[in-house]
A protein has these predicted regions:
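Active-site cavity-forming subdomains of large catalytic enzyme subunits
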Residues: 151-221, 225-230, 255
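Mid-to-C-terminal polyanion-binding domains and interfaces
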Residues: 21-22, 98-99, 327-331, 337-366, ...
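Hydrophobic helix-and-loop "lid/oligomerization" segment in the mid-to-C-terminal part
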Residues: 21, 30-35, 40-161, 181, ...
Length: 579
């Protein structure tokens, strides 16, 4: 090879990282505020200055709030009777039990709805109630109260009281029908409240304008748990494993009451007596005593959600509340298989949708017949991460397009579409996500509305979502003790994110693929005398580029890898860029 060509090749290889290793997120460094007094307080609690800085930045800034954060207590749970209409709800349910009425618990088809319904079912049965649980089918019943389902249960099964869990505040038609048939409806919900509320017998909701409940961010299962505590007149500790699952699955704020509920709930999960949960953990290859919030978020919740995404969600109630070993095993196996099927369906739609992307468009509106509407939100989220654009993925059936949107931070999808409700048969959502149904003929109008919105706003349509970097890590002083110190901030989740660290000035010693289909990547990096492994899920195809890249910078989280009796510190890659 001529020397000039050789030099050009070397220069290209040195530049190749710039083209191929590009960050998924816009990196944002947290302010490094060090408060001397709080650092001393944190030191007394056994926390180093780096943890103190992070806590201070997250609003934990005095001794009392630190103690409550590090040592959550059930005694700090708020009085359930502070919730709007709790007294009316409890009185009506007790009356129904005393009179032997048939009660319907009407839930939702996701993990929060499943656990909410299970919580209320077990509580009512403790009081001797005759109750029936129904979780609506996503495909035939839709979300929330369904008038025809209500009518069926009232007429065919003699239901005279309906208690909704994790739904109801938008169920005007069904609730009006039930009330007109002489059946009271008690709504327990946590979703955004419409301007006009349904005419229900009672509405128990943490954000109700006529009450001042101290914590607004309970999940549906949290509200159900509050009802259970009020009915049974004490904190129902044995229900907290269900509360933890629903709360983590619904990605609500893990602060205040939710932090308490999840902390205790995870402990309960560690020695759960629920045979269905034991079966699920066994099938996922997880020992009960190893359960943490990530186990729920990545193993238990997706399995429960898969059932509601693809099929009838009602077997989940038998799984969570049943006592039959054989039945629990069969349902857990069926749910496991549904989850595997869900993964295959998502991958198939994702690959098909990718071929439909229009590079000229600022927002991708992708619609096709034959796509399972239960998984389109997942597909839209994956495409958003890959493209850095707002994505809407819709299934076409009988002349209508129904699906989900996921949006970058720079584009408020709800603000963009809310003024154009005439486009939709149904529409709802918030800044980052939305669900919608519209006539197929209006798809081009939908696309144009979004393109116009972006142009008029001057929004950065390809703006990446922000990644908050908490601190820069010194690899040469990093140890297992560092990990343990930060783990005292767990459980992690919304508003208490797992700390993300910035590392640079290290040497990549090796990069190798791992996992099924070589999908994942493991780097060995070093700095001075220190060396660590970095695991990067889904990055296997970039092994060569990572091995050759100079001046690599990583955003990572810390974890502990236990294998064959050995314990080692491991870094988990969140994002990568080149300096």
């Amino acid at each position: 090879m001529p020397k000039s060509c050789y030099n050009e090749t070397i220069e290209f290889l040195e530049r190749v990282d710039v083209f191929l290793i590009t960050p998924t997120y816009e990196w944002q460094f947290a302010p490094q505020v060090e408060d001397v007094d709080f650092t001393k307080i944190a030191k007394k609690a056994g926390l180093g200055p780096e943890v103190a800085r992070l806590l201070f930045e997250r609003g934990i800034q005095d001794e009392e709030s630190l103690k409550k954060f590090l040592e959550p207590s059930l005694e700090d749970l708020h009085d359930p009777y502070l919730l709007h209409d709790m007294d009316k709800a409890v009185e009506r349910i007790r009356q129904a039990i005393e009179d032997g009425e048939n009660i319907l618990i009407y839930g939702d088809y996701d993990a929060d709805g499943m656990t909410s319904a299970s919580i209320v079912k077990e509580s009512l049965e403790q009081l001797g109630a005759e109750c029936r649980v129904y979780l609506p089918n996503r495909f035939t019943d839709g979300y929330g109260p369904n008038a025809s389902v209500y009518k069926y249960f009232i007429e065919q099964e003699g239901i005279s009281l309906i208690v909704t869990v994790d739904n109801g505040v938008a169920g005007h038609e069904a609730i009006e029908l039930a009330q007109s048939m002489g059946v009271d409806v008690i709504v327990t919900d946590h979703h955004s409240m419409p301007e006009t509320l349904p005419d229900a017998y009672a509405i128990v909701h943490p954000e109700h304008p006529d009450a001042d409940y101290p914590f607004k961010y309970l999940a549906g299962c949290g509200v159900a748990f509050k009802l259970a505590c009020a009915l049974l007149e004490e904190v129902q500790v044995e229900l907290l494993d269900l509360v933890a699952i629903g709360t983590i699955a619904d990605m609500v704020s893990l602060t205040d009451e939710n932090r308490i509920l999840v902390q205790y709930g995870l402990e309960m999960l560690g020695h759960t007596q629920r045979i269905g949960l034991q079966e699920m953990l066994d099938m996922a290859g997880i020992a009960a005593n190893e359960v943490i919030e990530e186990t729920v978020g990545f193993q238990i919740a997706p399995r429960l959600n898969a059932l509601g995404r693809l099929d009838d969600p009602n077997p989940a109630i038998d799984l969570l509340t049943g006592f039959d070993d054989e039945e629990a095993h069969e349902i857990a196996l069926m749910i496991h298989q549904k989850n595997e099927e869900r993964k295959e369906i998502v991958q198939s739609i994702y690959e098909e949708a990718k071929t439909m992307v229009d590079p000229e468009k600022k927002v991708q509106v992708l619609a096709k017949e034959g796509w399972n509407p239960g998984v389109l939100g997942i597909v839209a989220g994956r495409l958003l991460e890959e493209l850095g654009q707002t994505v809407i993925v819709l299934n076409i059936e009988d002349g209508r397009a129904k699906g989900s949107a996921r949006s970058v931070e720079a584009v408020d999808i709800f603000e963009a579409l809310d003024p154009h409700r005439d486009l939709f048969i149904a529409f709802g959502g918030h800044a980052g996500a939305a669900g919608m149904t519209l006539e197929v003929e209006k798809l081009s109008d939908l696309s144009q509305v979004l393109e116009d919105y972006i142009r008029e706003k001057g929004a950065d349509a390809s703006g990446k979502n922000k990644l908050n970097l908490d601190e820069e890590l010194d690899l040469e002083t990093l140890s297992l003790e560092t990990v343990k110190s930060f783990e005292r901030l767990a459980p992690f989740g919304m508003d208490n994110q797992k700390p993300v660290f910035y590392i640079k000035d290290f040497h990549v010693e090796s990069a190798r693929t791992m996992g099924a289909g070589n999908a994942h990547l493991k780097l060995k990096i070093s700095k001075g005398e220190a060396s660590f492994e970095v695991v990067a899920f889904g990055q296997g195809r970039w092994a060569t580029e990572f091995a050759q890249t100079k001046k690599l910078e990583l955003a990572v989280t810390l974890s502990v890898n236990q294998w064959n009796g050995q314990t080692a510190l491991q870094l988990m890659m969140v994002d990568a860029r080149v300096e």
